[in-house]
């Protein structure tokens, strides 16, 4: 059963296309939900990488996880302005308190002045062949 009530604390699991866990967030708080997306917020949360290395996010962030779109958007509140990161990813699934999605490597970082940079192009090219990403990506 889905439990997206405002204020609920969930976890986040990010997978790769081959089904292996890529990273996890220990918590995120539900801020809102619509028919299209789930909005969550976090601040200095613990992230565990697939290598078991852990670190904490440096700033407050709000994430829009989409139910039917192949990306999600993170707004990062940094000391030098508001940054956005758009991650190419599967629509999320909810499973017993965990938001789950597949990461497809490509990201777009948008700076406070509106400029942007596409990130991880080489990682995408490599994983696309290795993991046989669908052509529609």
Model-identified regions with their sequence ranges:
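Charge-rich, low-complexity N-terminal segments
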Residues: 1-58
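Short acidic-glycine loop/turn motifs at beta-strand connectors
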Residues: 33-35, 77-80, 110-115
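Short, well-ordered strand-loop elements centered on a beta-strand within folded domains, enriched
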Residues: 38-41, 80-88, 115-122
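Short, surface-exposed beta-strand-loop junctions and turns on beta-sheet-rich folds
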Residues: 45-48, 92, 124-125
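A short, polar/proline- and glycine-enriched secondary-structure boundary/capping micro-motif
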Residues: 49-54, 96-97, 127-131
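Phosphate/ribose-recognition catalytic cores of enzymes acting on nucleotide-derived substrates
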Residues: 52-93, 106
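Short loop/turn motifs at secondary-structure junctions and domain boundaries
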Residues: 98-102
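A hydrophobic, small-residue-rich beta->alpha segment in the mid-to-C-terminal subdomain
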Residues: 104-137
